From Swiss-Prot:
Species lineage: Bacteria, Pseudomonadati, Pseudomonadota, Gammaproteobacteria, Enterobacterales
Gene symbol of the encoding locus: rlmF
Protein name: Ribosomal RNA large subunit methyltransferase F
Compartments in which it is found: Cytoplasm
The organism of origin for this protein: Shigella dysenteriae serotype 1 (strain Sd197)
NCBIfam families recorded: PRK11727.1
Keyword Disulfide bond: no
SUPFAM superfamilies cross-referenced by the UniProt entry: S-adenosyl-L-methionine-dependent methyltransferases
Length: 308
């Protein structure tokens, strides 16, 4: 019997241990990065960023029909099971208005990244349509290359450059647009120094030297912003009030539970009608996202049925 990964959403495709033989058939370059654990089990060299990228290529091709995926060196290489979990929990949140998961939901991904991971999973699993925003032109080019290299994605995913410094929704959500939800994996650290220190800790934990790259990687805009995660999400909350009738649910990952109280206070200040916290777990890692809406139950039901 395959061992189960604790805590993953019931619809997550990654409950069992990776079938490395199958994944190596899907992406033969993964084979060179296989290693043995102290218990003698075959695994992937997760300390090697090229190994993690090869694993992601195989997972996305095998489970999500993304035959062509790549990212430039130095950009964030996200864990696929964890990102899939976020998508499935978001689907549950969207289902509460009508009792079923909407098949043609429109989702806004704030900071789509060079990897385009959330749209790739959401399109395959639920047939959703995505708009991805990004401040980095290099990340945007990478995401567009992924979309263009996989037939059908151009019809489901569109990208927009955020040109307004410090803005999140302003300049991205157009006047007459409506979205079922937004999702975001905000920058965690509050300075470049803090981001470097975090990378150093991970290097030490993995037994790497300073010259070794990290699969956690990430560019400046992916890892840190002035004031860190709390300040970024507070800015989201502040701007969200101006789009209260165009967005059913605003959501964001929150990396640390202790960051929740100031965010709850900010949500009270802007008059959020309902606030939800979704807890998630991937192995030993605990995470959560918060969601808020300015619509009551009846307004959300009408919103979901607007063009169905």
């Amino acid at each position: 019997m395959s061992a189960q990964k604790p805590g993953l959403h019931p619809r997550n495709r990654h409950h069992s241990r990776y079938d490395l033989a199958t994944l190596c058939q899907v992406n033969p370059e993964l084979r060179q990065f296989l290693t043995l654990t102290p218990a003698g089990e075959q695994s992937v060299d997760f300390a090697n960023p090229l190994a993690v990228k090869a694993l992601n290529k195989a997972l996305l091709a095998h489970f999500y029909a993304v035959a062509n995926w790549d990212i430039p060196d130095g950009f964030l290489c996200p864990p696929v099971p964890g990102r899939a979990d976020h998508i499935h929990h978001l689907a549950d949140l969207l289902a509460e208005a009508s009792g079923t998961i909407p098949a043609n939901a429109s989702i806004l991904d704030i900071g789509v990244g060079a990897n385009c991971i959330y749209p790739l999973i959401g399109v395959h699993e639920y047939g959703w349509r995505f708009t991805g925003s990004e401040t980095s032109s290099q990340a945007l080019s990478s995401a567009q290359a992924i979309i263009s290299a996989n037939p059908g994605l151009n019809r489901a995913i569109r990208l927009r450059r955020q040109k307004e410094s410090g803005a999140i929704f302003n300049g991205i959500i157009h006047k007459n647009e409506q979205y079922d939800a937004t999702l975001c994996n905000p920058p965690f650290h509050d300075s470049a120094a803090a981001a470097r220190a975090g990378s150093e800790r991970k290097r030490r934990n993995l037994g790497l030297n300073k010259d070794d790259a990290l699969n956690f990687g990430g560019q400046q805009q992916e890892l840190w912003c002035e004031g860190g995660e709390v300040t970024f999400i507070k800015k989201m909350i502040e701007e969200s009030k101006g789009f209260a009738k165009q967005m059913m649910w605003f959501t964001s990952l929150v990396s640390r539970g202790e960051n929740l109280p100031p965010l709850y206070r900010a949500l009270t200040d802007v008059g959020a009608v309902k606030v939800v916290k979704k807890e998630m777990a991937q192995g030993q890692k605990q995470s959560r996202f918060i969601a808020w809406t300015f619509m009551n139950d009846e307004q959300r039901r009408r919103f979901v049925n607007r063009q169905r």
